[in-house]
Design a protein with these regions (language model features):
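Small-residue-enriched transmembrane helix starts and helix-helix packing motifs
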Residues: 4-46, 69-73, 148-176, 197-205, ...
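Juxtamembrane transmembrane-helix termini in multi-pass membrane transport proteins
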Residues: 19-99, 183-198
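Short helix-coil transition sites and intra-membrane helix breaks within transmembrane domains
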Residues: 40-50, 120-127, 173-181, 212-216
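Divalent metal-coordination and catalytic microenvironments
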Residues: 48, 207, 254
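Membrane helix-loop-helix hairpins that form the core translocation module of multi-pass transporters
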Residues: 65-148
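Membrane-helix interface motif
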Residues: 85-93, 177-188, 219-223, 258-273
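Transmembrane helix exit motif
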Residues: 113-147, 215, 251-269, 297-306
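C-terminal regulatory/interaction regions
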Residues: 196, 226, 235-321
């Protein structure tokens, strides 16, 4: 391919991207819904603080491809319901509250509280109920009784991740507002012929997000299979990772939300990347949350769970001899 052909191709791709991210007025209903769906696909695949941390937690806790896909589907269903409401508000002009007030802080706090409560529920009854000391290498001051139990008993003590909570979590997280939300709420939704059509913009956006979240959920759920663990070990690692991530991730979300509430300027601090796609256009608080919850807390919890499962299996093998 010649340099001229390459430049022409890049120009076409940039023109298409510009059309999607800056849609003109006067579009037909079908075009509006198509653009909303494509935006949803882009939203689902890019690292977003309102989707990835929660999808990671619920998906990896399901410890299977089918379970991960289910978690992504359920979470996105709640998210889709909220987006339908949001685009309806955009059509009637009530979504201007997002212009007048920064709601990121309250949403982060609420999402964090729900994550913490679910994580605490999963950890209650085992020595994992205060995982901070072990995660950060501090003094172990609580009982380690469960570490001496057979792996079947330990696995049963860490409760299964309640998939239905993912729906509620998706609905709450949907109230967060970013670049994609701006496009569907203030540009696409007002172009619909009536208020009865306005929710369809949010629904198609949610469905696009759902497609990618199902794929991402399945990917997260299969991380542990790389190490070829037994089903019992995978269950333990998945559940303990999900529980720790929700528990500690909830604290992180609530803490950052409180900071944004107290010092709103923090939410405006960002490094421009030059990429026009929302979620990739800058590195700011949202990016820090994704890295902190999924990259640091999630991966650390996964590593801890893996080491614990191997140690428990080794103990079980030794005791059986």
């Amino acid at each position: 391919m010649s340099a001229r052909q390459t430049n022409n191709r890049c120009g076409i791709e940039l023109s298409f991207l510009g059309f999607i991210l800056n849609p003109p007025t006067g579009l037909s209903v079908y075009f509006i819904l198509l653009i909303a769906f494509i935006l949803g696909l882009m939203h689902g695949i890019t690292p977003d603080e309102h989707t990835w941390p929660i999808t990671f937690s619920y998906s990896i806790g399901s410890y299977s491809t089918k379970g991960g896909m289910k978690s992504g589907f359920i979470f996105s269903s709640g998210f889709t319901v909220q987006r339908a409401i949001l685009t309806t508000l955009g059509f009637v002009g009530l979504a201007t509250i997002y212009i007048k007030f920064n709601l990121d802080g309250p949403v982060y706090v609420l999402v964090g509280v729900v994550m913490f409560v679910v994580g605490y529920y999963l950890l209650k009854g085992t020595d994992l109920h205060i995982p901070l000391d072990r995660l950060f290498g501090g003094h172990v001051h609580h009982s380690t009784k469960s570490e001496r139990l057979p792996i079947q008993e330990v696995e049963s003590n860490v409760k299964a991740v309640p998939a239905k909570m993912a729906f509620f979590h998706g609905f709450i997280a949907g109230w967060g507002f970013g670049g994609f939300s701006t496009i569907i709420t203030f540009i696409l939704a007002p172009q619909m012929p009536s208020v009865f059509y306005a929710p369809l913009v949010g629904v198609l956006f949610g469905l696009g997000t759902m497609v990618m979240q199902v794929v991402i959920g399945a990917t997260f759920a299969n991380i542990m299979r790389v190490k070829k663990l037994s089903l019992e070990q995978i269950k333990y690692v998945g559940r303990s990772t999900a529980a720790r991530t929700l528990y500690l991730g909830g604290i992180a979300f609530a803490a950052i939300g409180a900071l944004v509430l107290g010092f709103p300027f923090i939410d405006r601090i960002a490094i421009n990347t030059g990429n026009p796609i929302p979620n990739l256009s800058s590195i700011g608080v949202a990016t820090v949350l994704v890295i902190m919850v999924v990259g640091v807390i999630g991966m650390s919890s996964l590593y801890m769970g893996y080491r614990e499962s191997v140690a428990l299996q080794r103990t079980k093998t030794t005791e059986s001899k």
